[in-house]
């Protein structure tokens, strides 16, 4: 965790610079992040196809380029997600049929958890420590790659709750959100997977 603290400090510093940008500029920043990833991946794909004959090696090179782009964007993307959380404070919306007021500004420990998850590690957290909010950061970052992100929960209630609750953050960042329930028709499930 000590190795991650300088990155958290950078994220918090970048977040302060975002206080005066418009909501439209937030969406534009998300698009810029996507563009960086697409360019990096396309360049790696072209290079891999020209220089590598092994398909597995080509895929590795392309995924490595995507991973490197995501790591490069991580501080700015996490800062942007934190800014959206701050802006939502005081807002209310319906979550599983109940009006819910947003009052969450991510703590450093939640940002640390997001970094740990993004890097493919397990982050153990106790009840009430903000696991749902922690997931916002790596979900947003990895969704920028355009391949979709799936979060698995233990039951239908949590799937719907978390999609509706955190969905406002994702939407303000320019993402779409869907969720799957056991009772859904296959066509509806299919459209939500996209």
What are these language model-derived features?
Residues 80, 84, 165, 172:
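Solvent-exposed, charged/polar functional surfaces in cytosolic regulatory/catalytic domains
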Residues 114-116, 141-142, 169, 192:
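Hydrophobic/aromatic ligand-binding patch that stacks against planar heteroaromatic rings
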Residues 1-129, 133-140:
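Conserved pre-motif I regulatory segment
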Residues 119-129, 134-164, 172-173, 180:
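Conserved SF1/SF2 helicase motif Ia
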Residues 167-194:
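Conserved motor-coupling elements within RecA-like helicase/translocase cores
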Residues 14-21, 151, 179-184:
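Short, exposed beta-strand "edge-strand" segments with a Pro/Gly-rich flavor and a Y/T-containing core
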Residues 23-26, 163, 189:
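Short functional linear motifs
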């Amino acid at each position: 965790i000590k190795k991650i603290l300088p990155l958290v400090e950078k994220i918090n510093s970048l977040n302060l610079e975002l206080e005066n940008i418009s909501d439209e500029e937030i969406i534009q920043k998300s698009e810029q992040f996507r563009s960086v990833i697409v360019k990096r991946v396309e360049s790696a794909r072209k290079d891999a196809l020209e220089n590598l004959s092994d398909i597995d090696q080509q895929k590795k090179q392309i995924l490595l380029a995507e991973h490197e782009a995501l790591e490069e964007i991580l501080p700015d993307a996490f800062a942007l997600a934190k800014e959206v959380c701050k802006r939502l404070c005081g807002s209310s919306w319906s979550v599983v049929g109940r009006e819910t007021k947003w009052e969450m500004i991510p703590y450093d420990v939640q940002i640390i958890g997001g970094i740990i998850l993004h890097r493919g590690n397990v982050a153990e957290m106790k009840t009430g420590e903000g696991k749902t909010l922690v997931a916002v950061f790596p979900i947003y970052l990895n969704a920028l790659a355009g391949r979709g992100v799936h979060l698995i929960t233990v039951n239908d209630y949590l799937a719907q709750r978390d999609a509706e609750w955190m969905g406002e953050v994702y939407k303000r960042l320019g993402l779409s959100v869907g969720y799957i329930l056991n009772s859904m028709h296959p066509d509806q499930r299919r459209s939500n997977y996209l």
